[in-house]
Amino acid sequence: MANQVIKCKAAVAWEAGKPLSIEEVEVAPPKAHEVRIKIIATAVCHTDAYTLSGADPEGNYPVILGHEGAGIVESVGEGVTKLKAGDTVIPLYIPQCGECKFCLNPKTNLCQKIRVTQGKGLMPDGTSRFTCKGKTILHYMGTSTFSEYTVVADISVAKIDPLAPLDKVCLLGCGISTGYGAALNAAKVEPGSTCAVFGLGGVGLAVIMGCKMAGAARIIGVDINKDKFARAKEFGASECINPQDFSKPIQEVLIEMTDGGVDYSFECIGNVKVMRAALEACHKGWGISVVVGVAASGEEIATRPFQLVTGRTWKGTAFGGWKSVESVPKLVSEYMSKKIKVDEFVTHSLPFDQINEAFDLMHAGKSIRTVVKL
């Protein structure tokens, strides 16, 4: 099958705001420096829902969504040297070419090698590998894991431990790595510190895990859904608060609770008003607030400059700052040695033909992560 078109099932988004449709698609063989992967498991993330809603400025249709997956290499294109058929892999929405100025700079993980084409839903050569009913279907985030087979650039693949359970480690393709790295790499949380985590979904729980790993003495979870508090405490939150329980702004509540503010705060929702609250909940002189959530297109953040003049830092992170190709295998190893939690994030498991239910569970706030098995 290596040089042939594969016919398989995929969940196609024909247009914004409509449920995904399970279709038979054709997946072309990998071209030079591309890899075709048989996807074994994929999770559904808020970013997929964000694009499907129509709010994503890079949302193009028809498209195969999905970016939190894991699978086995089926075949490789010409010039691929670091991967071979049979390798166990996680596709990466942030690549690591190792050559661009971003990859060569230790301060960032934002490889730009294929950014332009990836943003258009195309492979690096400007074309797609997917067709359905005679129509070209676009790629998504360079990964498109909602398909039994997908084609990705060879710089967008992490080769991982073949013994790793793919229905678990697929989560390391986005949410867990993003939150965990926000605490360790972006904030650089210090032992004995106080942290506040806004938004207790999968990413927020991963931030809590990272804060705890870094030795934070106090971790305050913040969410308007109190049903999320028990799980947040299982992950390491010392206490949880609901902004709706207070008559004053949540930043004032946190400042009073922590003798002047928290050392580190994290916004894991994508709400610009919450981003402001997270910054203003930080301690004068040294507080750091990390924006992790993705806001809707066109949204702007605001605060008084005095907040920054008086020593607070506002920063953001993508994929937790991890340089992807080299870091994801290490994160899988940390999971395999029980250093980090992954299983605990999986609240539901569904067969592929019920993938739309995964979105329903997420919108209802009933799931942390739903894993879909292909």
UniProtKB/Swiss-Prot annotation:
What InterPro entries does this protein's entry cite? Answer: ADH-like_C, ADH-like_N, ADH_3, ADH_Zn_CS, GroES-like_sf, NAD(P)-bd_dom_sf, PKS_ER
Q: What terms describe the molecular function in GO for this protein?
A: alcohol dehydrogenase (NAD+) activity; fatty acid binding; formaldehyde dehydrogenase (NAD+) activity; identical protein binding; S-(hydroxymethyl)glutathione dehydrogenase (NAD+) activity; S-(hydroxymethyl)glutathione dehydrogenase (NADP+) activity; S-(hydroxymethyl)glutathione dehydrogenase [NAD(P)+] activity; S-nitrosoglutathione reductase (NADH) activity
Q: Which PROSITE patterns match?
A: ADH_ZINC (PS00059)
Q: Does the keyword Phosphoprotein apply?
A: yes
The record's comment on protein family reads: Belongs to the zinc-containing alcohol dehydrogenase family. Class-III subfamily.
How does the annotation summarize its subunit structure? Homodimer.
Name of the protein this chain belongs to:
Alcohol dehydrogenase class-3
Species name: Bos taurus
